Amino acid sequence: MKLKPTTEKTLIDCLAITLAIFIPYHQVAQHTFTDYDDNGYLFQNNHINIGLTWDNIGWAFTTTEMANWHPLTWISHLIDRELFGIHPGGYLLMNVAWHMLAACLAYLAFLHCTKSRLFALTVALIFALHPVNVENVAWASERKSILNAVFWFAALISYLRFIETKSFKAYGLTVIFFILSLFSKAMSVTLPCTLMLIHCLYFVYHPDQRRLPERLRQEWKSIILPACSLLILSLYFSVVTMSAQSIAMNENIDLSDRVINALISYQRYLGMFFHPTQLALFYPLRSENPLLWGSTVPALLLLFALSVVALLLARKKPQLVIGWAWFLGTMVPVIGLVQVGGQSHADRYLYIPLLGLAFVFPVLFEMLGSLGVWFKKSLISFSLMILAVSMLAATQIQVSYWQDGVSICRHSLAVTGYCFNPVVSLSITYTRTGRFDELFAMLDSYIALEDNPWNKGILATIKANVLYTMGRHQAAADSVQKALSWGFTNKVSYALAALSFYELGQTNQAILYLAKAKVAPELQMQNSLLAFPLREKLTWLDLRLEEKITPKPNL
């Protein structure tokens, strides 16, 4: 059966997008897991290691492990466990496959919306190949972002169908896909607002006899009301997410610092989109840095200026103001006003928002097409090819940094300088792989650089725990005492001190630290290097010390 020309072109474009993704991302088949979240999500997660069972499906819908509620993401990991066992390449190739599907759905959504092959292909290729999206694909733990995008674009397609047909079935599918996206990652709470924007973009490319402003005024109810009913779901899932993430929320950051960081982060995201170099795993939030205050005014002026430009061009190029609103709005859940963790911003957060910024490129290409020159089609094709090839080359390099936990953490530290989180992740990897000389050299150098006493204590306690397991009890005792002197006082540090002194035969010191360990607070952090079986260790030490101090009867 011969396909229609439009269908043939659509298939060709989707195949081109898929192939373009495969070229830089095929290397992940040889990559390994990292010790930054992959351990908690995958290879050290007891439920995932059991595989797909009814009990684990129930667990997926009730757990808030990893400070998130995303049951569909957990189920996808369980399925991968059944398919690939513990082979990292399988999980990562599935990420690539999901990313291919998301990019093709993005192409179909924008093709449906704009009827412009140029617009759809340009935006989809930017989404598919932009190096800032590598983190979402080459990091097994970020499956949630890709799944969310797949159902996000499916919701856009069904909603566009609803715009055209007013079909209850199409609207019902939109609701279902929206719920599935929320089950994957709660960042999609902004989808209802995005549906309003996609409705406006649809009007731009499907004009009638009315001017666009007049049409928007007359049909505002048809734009707002269908999306508003979905906002109820957004509100509910926002509450669920806030509850799940409460354990990871950073309440020590003042609201003023969070607002400042949010403004500066918008500026940084713009820079990451248009000049994606020096990308890192973790960008530390340094609220005490006085330079942040100096950067606030330029960031605010930039956002204001770009907003004014977009509004001034709204009559001639409404795509620009729609794209700008897409970017600003979809960033809100992750911009840092509610601070979760210690990062100032993250590559992975730009996965959906960058689509709004991508609108500028098809607009530029359309302007090239309006030039009265005979080679304008060749000029557009050449420009699009240059854009795609440059992104592909940058992505190829960025993917290579993710070959293992050591590679990505070292690269991240090279970009940002000393940063606590990658150092801890690297410590876990070095310990798990027996690279102790590198571990101790790294910890000694970074303990000297760390300004935060609590973080210094964590690094010193990590070192002490590894030394203790190696049988180097004196060095372990020295290291954990440094941690205690820096204020890192909790059950873990006191127990480690007690165990080390017991092995050294210093019973009085062991008794002293054991008594403190029994009443000290629990350590509220997930770290495999600080998560030894405390209760069993303390009970064992209690019995050993009791044997030592109980006098033997005279015979």
Model-predicted regions and their roles:
Residues 1-437, 450-458, 469, 503:
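Polytopic membrane enzymes that build or remodel cell-surface glycoconjugates and lipids
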